[in-house]
C-alpha cells in the first residue's frame, strides 16, 4: 500500500465530534473532489473519490449534518484506469447542502474558493479543511530530494484558500501551476510531518519519518559514488577528518568529556560522512547544524589544550593523507 493510501485510510478513521469541524471537512471534500450539475431540472452534487472508506465517511457526515440521503457507487476499473473509483452522489436536498457547505452563496452564485465559514473558522476548521482536501485529491511522495505533500486543486481560488488554511496552522505551503492544473504543495520535511499530525495521520507520519531518516543515513555514502562533484567530495573529506579528530579527542580526554560534548562527538564518529545538518536531525533532541558544529569545536579545542599540556599528539595528528585518500 502506498503512503498516500495509508494516510487516507488513517484520516478516514479520525474521530470528529464537533459539527462545525465535520462541516469544514465535508465542504473541502466537495470543493476539491466534487462537481455540481443540473439533471432533469434538479441540482446533483457528485464527489469522485479513490477510497471507499472516504466515500463512506462523506456519506455518514452529510447524512448526520443535513439529514439527506447520500448514495455511494463503485465505478469499476477500465483499461486506462487500473483501480476503482467511488462516486458519492447527493440528490436529496442538494440545493440546501450546496449553500450550507459554501459551494454556492445564498443567492446561488458559485463560490470558487473555500467557504467563508471555513476560511475564517477555528484552527480545528483549518485542520479539517486540509484533511478534507487531502482525502479528496491529495498525495504524498516517498521521502527524498523531491518529496512533497501535494493537493490537486479545482482552481487558483481554492488553492490560495488552502494555502491560507495552512498558514493559520503554522505550515508553509505554496501554490504552483503544473501541466495546466493548480496545485498546493508542502516540500519541507518538517512541515510535511507537522501537517500530517495536524490532519490526524500521526501513525503514517511516524512511518514517513522512519523512511526519511533511513534514507538520509544512507545518502552520504551514496553521494560519494559521484566523484564529479568536487564540492561534495571536499565536504565528505572534511567530515571524515572531523570524525577522526573527534575520535582522538575522546581518547585524550577520557572520562573528562562533558556529556553534551560527548553526545555530539559520538554522532560525528558514528556518522562519519554525514553533514552537520544531518547530524542535527539525528540528535535527540534534534539540534541545529550550528549547535552541532559548536559542540564539536569546543570538544576539539579542549582536547588539543589537554594534549599540549601533556605533550602528546593533538587531534590534528590523526588527519593523514592515507585517511583522506580513502574518500
UniProtKB/Swiss-Prot annotation:
Residues in the DNA-binding region annotation: 275-308
Record InterPro entries: Homing_endonucl, Sporu_reg_WhiA_N_dom, Sporulation_regulator_WhiA, Sporulation_regulator_WhiA_C, WhiA_LAGLIDADG_dom
Pfam families assigned: HTH_WhiA, LAGLIDADG_WhiA, WhiA_N
Superkingdom of this protein's organism: Bacteria
Residues annotated as signal peptide: none
Protein name, entry field: Probable cell division protein WhiA
UniProt keyword Cell cycle, yes or no: yes
This protein's record includes keyword DNA-binding: yes
GO BP annotations, alphabetical order: cell division; regulation of sporulation
Record-stated family: Belongs to the WhiA family.
GO MF, one example: DNA binding
Function: Involved in cell division and chromosome segregation.
HAMAP family, per database record: HTH_type_WhiA
Alphabetical UniProt keywords: Cell cycle, Cell division, DNA-binding
